[in-house]
Regions:
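Donor nucleotide-activated moiety binding/catalytic core segment of transferases
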Residues: 66-69, 234-285, 289-290, 294-295
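Active-site and donor-binding regions of nucleotide-sugar-utilizing enzymes
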Residues: 7-28, 37-158
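Catalytic donor nucleotide-activated moiety binding site of glycosyltransferases and closely related
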Residues: 39-54, 116, 127-130, 212-256
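Catalytic binding pocket for nucleotide-activated donors in carbohydrate/polymer assembly enzymes
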Residues: 277-376
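C-terminal alpha-helical cap of glycosyltransferases
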Residues: 357-373, 388-407
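Conserved catalytic-core segment of nucleotide-activated headgroup transferases in glycan assembly
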Residues: 18-21, 25, 172-239
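Nucleotide-activated donor-dependent transferases that construct or modify glycoconjugates
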Residues: 2-14, 189-197
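A nucleotide-sugar donor-handling region in carbohydrate enzymes
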Residues: 124, 132-196
Length: 407
């Protein structure tokens, strides 16, 4: 039987999230049945190679040169299927990569697929950004012969025709422990990506939020009033004084295996991103996790004028005057993600609290660190989710059933 040949395109500059989901899928494909390659920006190639996959970086800043290089690669690699790690990210890359979804569709007689992390059709491609700005994205997934939805972010259930739903493996799964593994100071894991520092709608309110949330998370952790170790991986370290009982360890980046080991060894993972790939890794690895989001408009300036603003909030984030709903810090996506997260067993496998609701946040952090009953309940939900994930077909079988290669 000849190998099926898949060429993945992960062309984002601001995050490894899209590429990590595609790489997770690709690593599940048996090498005696599938040949796999990844087209990436030059800076992303080492990340892909560290996962054990072949990378073909586009080295030029000139889109014409990159298109020529891709033409040569297609001729040499002879793919049966081109797979966008994210169709929208691929289109954004056109200015430097020379590639777009419509170009791939028109230029090559090769089946075309894309991952759909967020179920864009269910949201009718309408994306709401922090502060209320809404954009209808182009229906790029309609160009595809196949859509691939990663679970558990997408519900672990079979997809409609033209859609496959496959489970993420990440670094593997472990049961969530009912009690903490160690008796010394707990380790809290935090991570950020470069896109979290991009004000995508040039909104003053988003700028305020970008400055406020790291300080607010630090303030919540300090208010636990106990020794903690905070491991923070991301492009920028905290730029404010750290509370004396917090041992703050910062790294700009870690290799994928070390990143997963640090995450899996943590006692608590905290994120402001409901669709964080690291949150999926944490849930599968049995790491107690907390999502900090916001579901209501908070006029902090008005509360301050009335003397009713929480003292801790004005101390932690004095420049914050107003806060809007968000599920993904700092971009918003509150309404956009409602369909994919509704009736989804994944969201029951971690705790959520409104980031501005002090008592709820501190209670959730304390329960995740110390409360065996809460941890046992999460462990049961995680086990049930894993059972449903394992009932999904393996990636290779799902691709075979789609019967797309060599169309």
């Amino acid at each position: 039987v000849s190998l099926r040949r898949l060429l993945f395109l992960g062309l984002g500059h601001l995050s490894n999230g899209d590429v990590s989901i595609a790489a997770d899928f690709a690593r599940q494909l048996a090498p005696d049945r599938f040949a796999v390659g990844f087209v990436t920006p030059a800076a992303t190639a080492p990340y892909v190679q560290a996962t054990g996959l072949a990378a073909y970086p586009l080295e030029s800043r000139d889109p014409a040169h990159n298109l020529e290089a891709f033409d040569r690669l297609v001729a040499d690699f002879r793919p049966d299927l081109l797979v966008a790690a994210d169709a929208f990210t691929l289109d954004y890359s056109a200015a430097w990569s020379g590639l777009s979804m419509s170009l791939l569709r028109q230029r090559y007689d090769i089946a075309l697929a894309s991952f759909d992390q967020y179920d864009y059709p269910a949201a009718d491609y309408l994306v709401d950004f922090y502060g209320g700005h809404r954009t209808r994205f182009p229906r790029l997934l309609d160009l595809c012969d196949l859509q691939i939805r990663n679970s558990p972010l997408n519900r672990p259930a079979p997809g409609e025709p033209g859609v496959i739903v496959t489970r993420m493996v990440c670094g593997g799964s472990s049961p969530l422990p009912v009690s903490r593994r160690r008796q010394d100071r707990p380790t809290v894991f935090l991570t950020n990506s470069r896109w979290e520092y991009v004000n995508v709608v040039r909104s003053p309110a988003m700028t305020q939020l970008m400055r406020a949330i790291p300080r607010i998370i630090h303030n919540h952790l300090a208010a636990l009033n106990r020794p903690l170790r905070v491991v923070h991986v991301g492009p920028a370290r905290w730029e404010f004084p750290v509370a004396p009982r917090i041992d703050y360890r910062y790294a700009p980046r870690l290799a994928p295996a070390e990143f997963h080991a640090r995450l899996a060894g943590a006692d608590l993972f905290v994120t402001g991103n409901a669709v964080s790939v690291t949150l999926t890794q944490a849930v599968l690895a049995g790491v107690p996790s907390l999502l900090l989001d916001n579901h209501k408009l908070l006029d902090v300036a008005l509360l301050a004028r009335n003397g009713s603003a929480p003292a801790w909030l004005t101390q932690a984030a004095p420049q914050l005057t107003i806060a809007y709903p968000f599920r993904v810090y700092p971009w918003g996506w509150h309404d956009f993600l409602t369909p994919v997260l509704s009736d989804n067993p994944y969201v029951d496998c971690f705790l959520s609290a409104g980031v501005f609701e002090r008592r709820r946040v501190l209670r959730a952090m304390t329960e995740l660190l110390d409360d065996a009953t809460v941890r046992a309940r999460l462990a049961e939900r995680q086990a049930a989710l894993l059972h449903r994930l394992h009932r999904l077909p393996p990636a290779g079988d799902a691709l075979d059933a789609a019967k797309l290669a060599g169309r």
